């Protein structure tokens, strides 16, 4: 028998970044708010306390902070002609689980969009003509401009205690910042993260080649700081355990370090963990949400009536809940009609790994998730695309996140894969390598979308989300272009000898 709770004003589904921000902003209005999080309760202490959290096997390899994909996953296929199969082993994307969601285990990279990013279809059409856009690319402008969003970008940076160097402050170009960034109203709340030696080498090379290097924008605090909610953050100690880990030092911004301590003060807010939402309920017209139905920690079905329902789970789960609840028109790739599940896109990563001799040392273990030197010269519309044959672009960086022994130990391609020779290669290369990373955009296509799988179901008997996605020629051309640009930086411009390099795509 379904348990029916007392109605509330607002129910929030998913309690990561979006859910906690919505709860905080609404709590001050006096509305009665309930947040439902399907994972467990987690806080900086005791869950992320040192030394527990710096356990690479538990958190980095066994992925303790992530969704249990044995109970719910997505199915994946490349084209509509393929049979989708379940995503059984975490790899490319890592949905979080528990309070804080993916906002706990992220690296803290805190980029604003460029002005062109939000009106890319218009910009591309005006510069190169409508025929420059491939026929299967469903490029669209966003329904808002950068100037409309800037106050909210600014507020979130202040909530996070973000670190970085402004490059365009109220229209004034600032040396040392990103010269391509859109205008910002205020400087970063805290100073940039320190460079590792690899970033220093990259910065020197980039300047000599005519590029414009700058420190990466990060949701990682570099000074003692109290945010607008009255929550104090600590100073980063460069421990090298950001991605896949919670921050024990109160330095990396997360819901736990920036919002939840202030939110706890409101009696009109309630958080229920281990509450797995199955669907959004609607009235008889099918046009008005009336609440949600979820399974509680004791396995009971519960109905929570609410005047307002906010879906703030991981993006894949929001789409699935809309489809399961029959809200909105599902996207149809054959006709182009519908919006739910349309325009699924991802990102493309690559880079060059550089190995040096014993005279050049890199202490990668002193790192953060977002420190490093970057260039934006080949990002978005910051360069002329007329002769390159693709839309989009990349940031290029010397960005080191740590020197952890299991996941972040690298050897040259020529090294043995096991045994004494492998051990020697580890000793020879651990402190004598660096990488140049490339993070690239991916455009939307009519054949890349999300819908419900007709075969596979989750532990509650509901269809899994099906992902149809593959790399397209536009992105493959971009990757080859960026490989050439990146490898051109790996030259004698570096003052120290480079033994080998390898392109990783």
Where are the regions that the model predicts?
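A glycine-rich dinucleotide-binding beta-alpha-beta segment and adjacent secondary-structure elements
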Residues: 7, 216-220, 238, 273, ...
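N-terminal Rossmann-like FAD-binding beta1-loop-alpha1 element of flavoenzymes
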Residues: 9-35
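Residue-level detector of alpha-helix initiation sites
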Residues: 12, 16-17, 193, 197, ...
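Conserved N-terminal glycine-rich FAD pyrophosphate-binding loop of Rossmann-like flavoproteins
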Residues: 40-65, 96-108
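Glycine-rich loop(s) and the adjacent beta-strand/alpha-helix scaffold that form part
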Residues: 28, 32-34, 39-56, 249, ...
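FAD cofactor-binding and catalytic pocket of flavoenzymes
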Residues: 78-106, 112-113, 117-126, 133, ...
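A short, basic/flexible loop-to-alpha-helix module at the beginning of a structural domain
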Residues: 1-7
């Amino acid at each position: 028998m379904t348990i029916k709770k007392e109605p509330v004003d607002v129910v929030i589904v998913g309690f990561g970044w979006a859910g906690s921000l919505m709860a905080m902003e609404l709590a001050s209005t006096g509305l009665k708010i309930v947040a439902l999080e399907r994972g467990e309760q987690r806080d900086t202490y005791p869950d992320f306390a040192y030394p527990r959290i710096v356990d690479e096997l538990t958190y980095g390899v066994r992925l303790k902070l992530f969704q249990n994909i044995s109970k719910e996953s997505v199915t994946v296929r490349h084209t509509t002609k393929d049979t989708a199969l379940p995503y059984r082993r975490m790899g490319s994307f890592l949905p979080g689980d528990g309070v804080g969601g993916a906002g706990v285990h992220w690296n803290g990279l805190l980029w604003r969009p460029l002005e062109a990013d939000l009106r890319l279809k218009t910009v591309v059409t005006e510069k190169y003509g409508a025929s420059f856009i491939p026929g299967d690319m469903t490029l669209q402008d966003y329904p808002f401009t950068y100037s409309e969003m800037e106050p909210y970008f600014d507020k979130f940076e202040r909530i996070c205690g973000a670190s970085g160097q402004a490059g365009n402050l109220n229209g004034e170009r600032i040396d040392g910042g990103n010269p391509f960034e859109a205008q910002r109203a205020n400087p970063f709340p805290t100073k940039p993260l320190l460079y590792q030696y690899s970033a220093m080498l990259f910065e020197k090379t980039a300047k000599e080649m005519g590029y414009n290097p700058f420190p990466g924008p990060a949701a990682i605090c570099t000074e003692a700081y109290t945010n607008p909610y009255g929550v104090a953050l600590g100073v980063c100690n460069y421990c090298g355990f950001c991605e896949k880990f919670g921050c024990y030092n109160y330095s990396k911004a997360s819901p736990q370090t920036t919002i939840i301590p202030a939110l706890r003060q409101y009696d009109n807010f309630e958080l229920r963990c281990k509450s797995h939402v199955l669907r959004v309920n609607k009235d008889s017209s099918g046009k008005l949400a009336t609440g949600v139905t979820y399974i509680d920690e004791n396995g009971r079905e519960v109905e929570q009536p609410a005047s307002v329902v906010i879906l703030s789970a991981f993006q894949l789960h929001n789409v699935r809940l809309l489809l399961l609840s029959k809200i909105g028109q599902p996207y149809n790739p054959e006709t182009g009609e519908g919006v739910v599940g349309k325009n699924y896109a991802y990102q493309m990563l690559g880079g060059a790994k550089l190995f040096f001799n014993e005279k050049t040392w890199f202490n990668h273990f002193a790192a953060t998730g977002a420190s490093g030197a970057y260039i934006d010269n080949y990002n978005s519309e910051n360069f002329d695309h007329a002769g390159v044959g693709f839309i989009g672009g990349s940031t290029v960086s010397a960005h080191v996140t740590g020197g952890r022994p299991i996941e972040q130990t690298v050897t040259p391609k020529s090294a043995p894969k096991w045994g004494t020779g492998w051990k020697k290669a580890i000793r020879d290369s651990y402190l004598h390598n660096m990488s140049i990373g490339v993070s690239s955009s991916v455009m939307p296509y009519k054949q890349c979308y999300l819908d419900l799988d007709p075969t596979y179901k989750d532990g509650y008997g509901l269809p899994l989300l099906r992902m149809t996605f593959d790399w397209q020629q536009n992105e493959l051309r971009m990757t080859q272009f960026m490989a050439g640009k990146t490898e051109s930086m790996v030259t004698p411009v570096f003052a120290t000898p480079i033994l080998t390099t390898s392109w990783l795509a």
